């Protein structure tokens, strides 16, 4: 029952940056976000980018998000500098008035200009959204994986309606096993 109006990530989940995070290797885990309101920010609920220790088991439900200054609803950001395994993200019953960019954004190429050792490919798996409505955004789902499709997989959006999507579509690259079941964008059923 909290309201977030931060101008940055409304809720930011982290587990350490680069070598420090890998040294400790303790994932953030078992977080429930329920009955919250998110307004201005880079993302409503965000995992990363300092997520080198990993993350598992996020439950987000019954939340409202709405602002022309809210960039994304659910955001996962990491890179080959950070690494980490991010898994088991469950989101349901979310009402969004508007967001600037995308309802779901997964980005494995965050801050690609950072000078670092890039031998730590991250994995994002088991991310599931159900019963999410959004009345305005630029895209529905935006996934920026790596050059292959082995690091982002088992992603689903189900029983959801995204209206007034400016680009009228999703933009998914570098991912496999993406399921869109009963997802409507601008009133049209999205074919898998």
Question: Where are the regions a protein language model picked out?
Answer:
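Extracellular/periplasmic carbohydrate-active domains that bind, remodel
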Residues: 1-192
């Amino acid at each position: 029952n909290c309201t977030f109006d931060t101008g940055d990530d409304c809720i930011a989940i982290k587990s350490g940056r680069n070598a420090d995070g890998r040294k400790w290797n303790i994932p953030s885990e078992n977080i429930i976000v329920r009955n919250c309101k998110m307004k201005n920010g880079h993302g409503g609920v965000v995992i990363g980018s300092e997520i080198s220790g990993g993350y598992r088991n996020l439950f987000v439900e019954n939340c409202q998000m709405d602002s022309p200054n809210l960039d994304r609803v659910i955001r996962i950001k990491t890179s080959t500098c950070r690494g980490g395994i991010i898994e088991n993200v469950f989101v349901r019953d979310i009402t969004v008035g508007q967001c600037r960019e995308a309802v779901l954004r997964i980005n494995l190429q965050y801050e690609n200009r950072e000078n670092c050792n890039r031998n730590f490919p991250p994995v994002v798996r088991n991310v599931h959204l159900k019963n999410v409505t959004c009345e305005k955004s630029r895209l529905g789902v935006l996934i920026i994986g790596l050059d292959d499709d082995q690091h982002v997989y088992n992603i689903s959006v189900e029983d959801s309606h995204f209206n007034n999507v400016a680009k009228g579509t999703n933009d998914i690259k570098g991912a496999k096993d993406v399921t869109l079941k009963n997802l409507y964008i601008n009133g049209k059923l999205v074919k898998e």
